[in-house]
């Protein structure tokens, strides 16, 4: 209803009706009145034993709650997210147990009774497809090459990339075993950033964030593809909600000021709000400048249940949740067989938000509100003016008295 499929890669504007504009304006108005919460956010690398380990803890303290995000590249890159109803909750790490074959119980948020929500997200594999003979929108988008297991990557020491001023840190990795030299000049980077207040990043897709979220930016740079038209993707796994998987939905908007020609926002929700959520726009970029010309479509497969034994093992997920868990997985693929692609500059970047509480809701920008006011106001003024004209004309004729 809000988008049309363009000739090259994505969505182009469709003309909405005035009634649609009015309904969207009315529906979005309450969200524009919601308050913004500021949190005291700290970011630290938890010291490992006996050697430094990549365990990043983000603690966001609000007026009566605390959010914990624990990111790690022990095994595949993963994050454990925990929301508590106290400002005093703390993270406890048992390093000797965490680095053991059975790390269950090594990671805790105390007091346990304060935990209101917890889940995890694991980035298990880097996917690559040969899209030479693939059709638009096909799933999978071509013949798959053997995937790269992210549990078999070597990751940098994140202490060297820790930026406390911007509340960010980079996990940068390469395969431990790279017989073809595909990553000789390349790397895969997971950039994590936290926020103490609401706002938008300077670069597209400029997702609206609050103090309740972290942003993850995934960048594949300089790696040699195994084909002339390779498409890349990520396999993502999360904990199921009992026997069921989290829900995935799409939200549409007529406002594309912050992400030109992209009118859709995808959401993964763990249960009903307020709980946890993952948000992203279905767009990636093949150039560092992230102009519209370098935009790539991002497609998500259906979320499905999967066996834990089929996924790379995540020590921090087992450390917090134990070994008996139901997992759900889905794939994200970036690009299409035609148009711009990773092959242009050997660059791919995609962003998402991960948070707890109520997902951020976009309100209409001043520019779009002005356009809507004109679109809705002009017909109304014409109708009002026409009515006044007819009324005055009727009164003029009714006051006329014949001289006879």
From Swiss-Prot:
TM region positions: 371-391
Consequence recorded when altering residue 228 to A: Reduced glycosylation
Post-translational modifications: Highly N-glycosylated. N-glycosylation is essential for GLMP stability and for MFSD1 lysosomal localization.
Domain of life the protein comes from: Eukaryota
Localization annotation: Lysosome membrane
Signal peptide bounds: 1-35
GO terms (BP aspect): positive regulation of transcription by RNA polymerase II; protein localization to lysosome; protein stabilization
Cytoplasmic side: 392-404
Assigned protein family: Belongs to the GLMP family.
Functional note: Required to protect lysosomal transporter MFSD1 from lysosomal proteolysis and for MFSD1 lysosomal localization.
Protein name: Glycosylated lysosomal membrane protein
Organism: Mus musculus
Lineage, top ranks: Eukaryota, Metazoa, Chordata, Craniata, Vertebrata
